[in-house]
């Protein structure tokens, strides 16, 4: 018999009382007559009655829909995987859901975005100012003929201008796709050539670990191999713009200096408008490497991103409106999209552009301490670096505002768990999560209702019918099996780009167990409903 690992944390009575999960359970009791005394019963209901569960998420978190109440016709018109049809008749927009807080009298003048980079003074935007800059960029895109369905690609770092460009694109129904500027031209082109963008938002370089990296020649190389482009919006970062501007002029591409444009526009406030879209309208294209061939261009929708994002922020990560959310990420990783999506829940997002440990480990932790971050997201690799260097954040900065520490990207070791509670805080919920780019969601995550055992993930996420299957498709307990999801999630891909028969999409997830999503990880579910995730089963 396996030894049960020690419990490292349990929520206090005060933490539970203030949790959005407690508020949600109270909502279910008041509006549906449902009572849940533990997480397992809540999770079981969420996967047994998936229509009722997702309808409750829509209502409780106030999804903004222009359609008549309740904002849609039917929760789940078709339940098959792939091909589920969610919230038919909805009229929504991701950017509208994020920026609705700018119209809220208690939020409009509060801070929405705080950003720090290696070379710029710290910058902040209120909700009202963020919405105004989005409105100006929206007007720019519209003036260039950008419309619903056009692709807007970004070769950008983790800065507020990237957030604004995403929002402006989404507000029009254009489809966003981003890559980090430290990626090579071949890797970027392997992604963007597949989607034929009309617009490229880009930088001419970036700063990392005290060094300037000139990407102007790489950018011109990228431009040359994207014949679909009509517009280039450049954010000068190292001021190597002449060659880029010259190339755009020679080719007849519209060229806009983003810094000058926003500086001139910010003299007056504006309000963005929003195109009302169906639930399954494409929002962004993200990429996951296949075993062979080009990266998979995975299309996620406005609606699925909205309901999953609202659910996971509040009921998984335990973040309330007005709290502060930081995740160390680049624009080339799905966690950047998740960082931006925290705006939907009224969270202030914190962006750190550059090396998180330059000139020392205090850089990241001083930033989140100074701005009283309630959630800090880092990777197991970064935690491993801190362990190796014997760095203990609690000895250097005040982390009293920290409620949740997120970790994803790879399994977190037991030593990593111990480091969090010995070196960061004894009173923090460690949210070790797994899912990611492909489903646009976490299958395995956290709950403030449950204890945290050393080296183990807490739970199957609400609404996620996650199991560990043997080769014959039988669910396993206390044994390692294939991580699968047996019922559809609203955030699952709409399709892959340029995959008209959905063959590549089907072959990626549904060949081994028909009608069941096979994720490609090993998983063990114990009889305590606590999970351990192992290395990829496809490796």
Predicted feature locations:
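Conserved adenylation A10 loop of the ANL superfamily
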Residues: 119-121, 285-297, 313
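Structural core segment of the AMP-binding/adenylate-forming
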Residues: 171-260, 371, 379-380
């Amino acid at each position: 018999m396996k030894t049960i690992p020690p419990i490292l944390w349990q929520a206090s009575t005060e933490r539970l009382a203030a949790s959005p999960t407690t508020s949600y359970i109270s909502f279910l009791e008041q509006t549906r007559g449902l009572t849940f005394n533990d997480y397992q019963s809540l999770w079981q209901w969420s996967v047994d009655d998936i229509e009722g569960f997702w309808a409750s998420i829509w209502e409780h978190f106030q999804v903004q829909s222009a359609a008549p109440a309740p904002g849609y016709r039917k929760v789940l018109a078709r339940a098959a995987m792939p091909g589920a049809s969610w919230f038919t008749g909805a009229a929504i927009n991701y950017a509208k859901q994020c920026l609705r807080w700018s119209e809220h009298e208690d939020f409009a003048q509060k801070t929405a975005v705080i950003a720090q980079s290696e070379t710029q003074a710290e910058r902040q935007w209120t909700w009202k100012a963020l919405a105004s800059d989005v409105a100006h960029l929206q007007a720019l895109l519209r003036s260039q003929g950008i419309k619903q369905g056009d692709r807007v690609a970004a070769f950008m770092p983790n800065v507020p201008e990237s957030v604004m460009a995403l929002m402006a694109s989404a507000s029009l129904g254009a489809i966003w796709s981003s890559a980090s500027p430290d990626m090579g031209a071949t890797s970027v082109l392997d992604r963007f050539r597949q989607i034929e963008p009309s617009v490229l938002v880009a930088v001419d370089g970036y700063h990392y670990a005290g060094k300037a990296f000139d990407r102007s020649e790489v950018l011109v190389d990228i431009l040359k191999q994207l014949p679909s482009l009509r517009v280039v919006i450049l954010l000068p970062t190292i001021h190597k713009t002449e060659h880029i501007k010259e190339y755009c002029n020679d080719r007849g591409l519209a060229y806009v200096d983003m810094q000058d444009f926003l500086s001139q526009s910010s003299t007056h406030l504006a309000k963005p408008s929003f195109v009302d879209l169906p639930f399954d309208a494409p929002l962004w294209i993200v990429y996951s490497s296949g075993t062979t061939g080009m990266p998979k261009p995975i299309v996620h929708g406005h609606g699925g991103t909205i309901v999953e994002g609202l659910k996971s922020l509040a009921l998984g990560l335990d973040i309330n409106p007005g709290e502060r959310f930081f995740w160390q990420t680049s624009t080339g990783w799905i966690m950047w999209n998740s960082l931006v999506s925290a705006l939907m829940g009224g969270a202030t997002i914190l962006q750190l552009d550059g090396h998180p440990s330059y000139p020392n480990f205090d850089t990241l932790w001083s930033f989140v301490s100074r701005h009283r971050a309630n959630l800090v997201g880092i990777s197991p690799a970064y935690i491993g670096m801190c362990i190796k260097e014997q760095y203990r954040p609690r000895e250097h900065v005040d982390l009293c505002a920290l409620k949740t520490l997120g970790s994803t990207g790879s399994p977190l070791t037991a030593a990593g768990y111990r480091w969090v509670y010995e070196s960061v805080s004894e009173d923090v919920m460690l949210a070790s999560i797994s899912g990611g780019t492909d489903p646009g969601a976490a299958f395995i995550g956290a709950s403030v209702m449950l204890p945290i055992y050393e080296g183990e993930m807490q739970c199957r996420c609400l609404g996620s019918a996650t199991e560990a299957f043997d080769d014959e498709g039988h669910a396993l307990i206390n044994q390692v099996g294939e991580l699968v999801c047996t019922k559809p999630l609203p955030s699952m891909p709409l399709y892959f780009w340029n995959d008209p028969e959905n063959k590549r999409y089907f072959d990626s997830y549904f060949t081994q167990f028909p009608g069941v999503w096979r994720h490609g990880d090993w998983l063990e579910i114990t009889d305590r409903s606590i999970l351990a995730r192992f290395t990829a089963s496809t490796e």
